[in-house]
């Protein structure tokens, strides 16, 4: 029973996970750190990422803030150790496009991770390798040879574009992906991944030269 003038502080810790990662009921019992301990670990992790990723510019403070805001969005939107997903078109800030993945990741976002967090870049490319079977199936539906990566995909690699004409017309993604894979190899020299990616490159090459 609290006496007059006494204070009671309640500390509530939550954990966000999915059934793909761990049994939620088991995971909820693994939170043993206090808020201060979790905050200290998070601060160290973020300090390390900023040390690797920060970009300083000569310009107005608002411009510097904008650069860092975008870096923050890239880091938080990429699940660096989970190749079953990629980066949603609007990151974690918006529900537009239902969190689906586009070619923007392969051409525009990959470069950032190549030179700041190669492990994350590899994860993004492994997502494309993993979803090659769906790209082959998509090519069959379009009466094409080889593989044709869908315009708008979710975690299972299938076409999610609701507008048939856009999904059917946007062909360049099939060339964008092997280009991105080559960019990754050039930056890292990762021979093991290069061998994994060869099938994807070969099948998209068939589509390009049909």
Residue ranges and their predicted role:
Residues 60, 98-99, 111-115, 164-168, ...:
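Short, charged/polar micro-motifs that form catalytic or ligand-binding hotspots
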Residues 78-93, 119-179, 185, 192-195:
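Helix-terminus loop motifs that line ligand-binding clefts
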Residues 65, 99-106, 116, 169-176, ...:
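Aromatic- and histidine-enriched alpha-helix N-cap/loop-to-helix transition segments
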Residues 69-74, 105-119, 131, 175, ...:
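Alpha-helical support elements that line or immediately flank enzyme active sites
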Residues 204-210:
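Conserved small/polar residues in nucleotide/adenosyl-binding loops
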Residues 121, 201-202:
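Aromatic/hydrophobic pocket-lining residues that form the small-molecule binding cavity
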Residues 5, 108, 202-204:
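Residue-level preference for non-acidic, small/hydrophobic
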Residues 1-96:
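Acidic/polar, glycine-enriched structural segments that form the non-catalytic walls/loops
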